[in-house]
Amino acid sequence: MHRVTVTLDDDLMKKLDAIIEARGYQNRSEAIRDLARIGIQQTSAHASAEHCVGAMVYTYDHSKRDLPRKLTQSFHNHHELSRATMHVHLDHDQCLEVTILDGKANEIQHFADHIFSERGVRYGRLVTIPTSGDGHAHD
């Protein structure tokens, strides 16, 4: 095992300590090891060509110049990944979208990264779940 030193700002340290207490970790090292494993697992899953389903959640400012058009074009360019989208108007300018995706993990991640990087997209989160294959038909 290797010993490393990490510098954290006060706010991040408070949040880490809250996680440690809530989950019952014996010490910070144990918590940081688990969080590192989770991050590595997520990164590996998103980089693979394995089949998965996912939920992409993001908010955006629909009044930003050309943003709705750019988002629509991105969805058309990746139409094979998108299964369904729910659109909610949060206020006069902000919208929330939840999209169910189905395809290779690396392609889904690439699509989500493209959406999240658009100017005017304020928050983005992708959750993926590995599946056993390329989908199936119900008999």
From Swiss-Prot:
Entry-linked InterPro entries: Acetolactate_synth/TF_NikR_C, ACT-like_dom_sf, Arc_rbn_hlx_hlx, CopG, CopG/NikR_regulator, Ni_resp_reg_NikR, Nickel_NikR_proteobac, Ribbon_hlx_hlx
Which residues participate in Ni(2+) binding? 76, 87, 89, 95
Q: Which GO terms describe its molecular function?
A: DNA binding; DNA-binding transcription factor activity; nickel cation binding
The note on the cofactor says: Binds 1 nickel ion per subunit.
Q: Which GO terms describe its biological process?
A: response to nickel cation
Please give the cofactor(s) recorded in the UniProt entry for this protein. Answer: Ni(2+)
Q: Does the keyword Metal-binding apply?
A: yes
Task: Tell me the Gene3D superfamilies matching this sequence.
Answer: ACT-like. Chain A, domain 2, Met repressor-like
Instruction: Give the record's family classification.
Output: Belongs to the transcriptional regulatory CopG/NikR family.
Q: Please explain the role this protein plays, according to its UniProt record.
A: Transcriptional regulator.
- Under what name is this protein listed? Putative nickel-responsive regulator
Query: Which organism is the protein's source?
Result: Rhodopseudomonas palustris (strain HaA2)
